[in-house]
Amino acid sequence: MVIKAKSPAGFAEKYIIESIWNGRFPPGSILPAERELSELIGVTRTTLREVLQRLARDGWLTIQHGKPTKVNQFMETSGLHILDTLMTLDAENATSIVEDLLAARTNISPIFMRYAFKLNKESAERIMINVIESCEALVNAPSWDAFIAASPYAEKIQQHVKEDSEKDELKRQEILIAKTFNFYDYMLFQRLAFHSGNQIYGLIFNGLKKLYDRVGSYYFSNPQARELAMEFYRQLLAVCQSGEREHLPQVIRQYGIASGHIWNQMKMTLPSNFTEDDC
């Protein structure tokens, strides 16, 4: 297998995960002893130990003192964060994972948004107004750099929106605009989820963040997708302000259908790095 990684720990993690996925260390099997495995991968035992602990926390492995490390049935023991990893392992099924994400968001949003609009109306309105104004400023700015220079939240945005090594300035601007728009889209859903009064909804979005960023950074490279999303945000705000929460399911469902149509077009020309791991 060909593995690209930025650090020995990253290499070891990818090696073990890909070995589990490809059947070299199948679910239910026992991993080689620590010394043997560290020599096989080419990392120190200290590095390997740290990686094994992290993989155990993520549900890939079971580590018990005095017993061999066991490979789990990871689809039964892992959380939502595994979805982004599955994108990198199973590129052929990447689009179905995206569609599952979009469908799940459409299904749960009417529930938590209804509670957010009822229990924390003013906070919900502030979030949506902030997102709408920020997204309008972003798409109307002459460039991403100009938007950042004028934004009072520039430092926070740059903590979350990372630049890559794109040399073409036009492509760089397009990439950063898409990533920043996705930053606001995620903010709207995640914060409304927490304002529902049920922290589980917010934690669901936390668990999906890496996958959400991967998908949104591509999806929102489409100006049509950005315009559709902003109109959706405005409709949500209108529902919240009017108190007519019974309209939420229809508004969200219509957006889910329309955004699904855009995705169905975009998935035909996925970029080569769409399923690449960034670790």
From Swiss-Prot:
Matches recorded under InterPro entries = FA-response_TF_FadR, FadR_C, TF_FadR/GntR_C, Tscrpt_reg_HTH_GntR, WH-like_DNA-bd_sf, WH_DNA-bd_sf
Listed CDD domains: WHTH_GntR (cd07377)
The molecular function terms of the Gene Ontology recorded here are: DNA binding; DNA-binding transcription factor activity; fatty-acyl-CoA binding
Its Gene Ontology cellular component terms are: cytoplasm
Q: Pfam families of this UniProt entry?
A: FadR_C (PF07840), GntR (PF00392)
Annotated GO biological processes are: fatty acid metabolic process; negative regulation of phospholipid biosynthetic process; regulation of fatty acid metabolic process
| DNA-binding region ranges | 34-53
Subcellular localization, as worded in the UniProt entry:
Cytoplasm
Residues annotated as domain HTH gntR-type: 6-74
UniProt keywords, alphabetically: Activator, Cytoplasm, DNA-binding, Fatty acid metabolism, Lipid metabolism, Repressor, Transcription, Transcription regulation
Gene3D superfamilies the record matches? GntR ligand-binding domain-like (1.20.120.530), Winged helix-like DNA-binding domain superfamily/Winged helix DNA-binding domain (1.10.10.10)
Describe its assembly.
Answer: Homodimer.
The entry's function note states: Multifunctional regulator of fatty acid metabolism.
Q: What is this protein called?
A: Fatty acid metabolism regulator protein
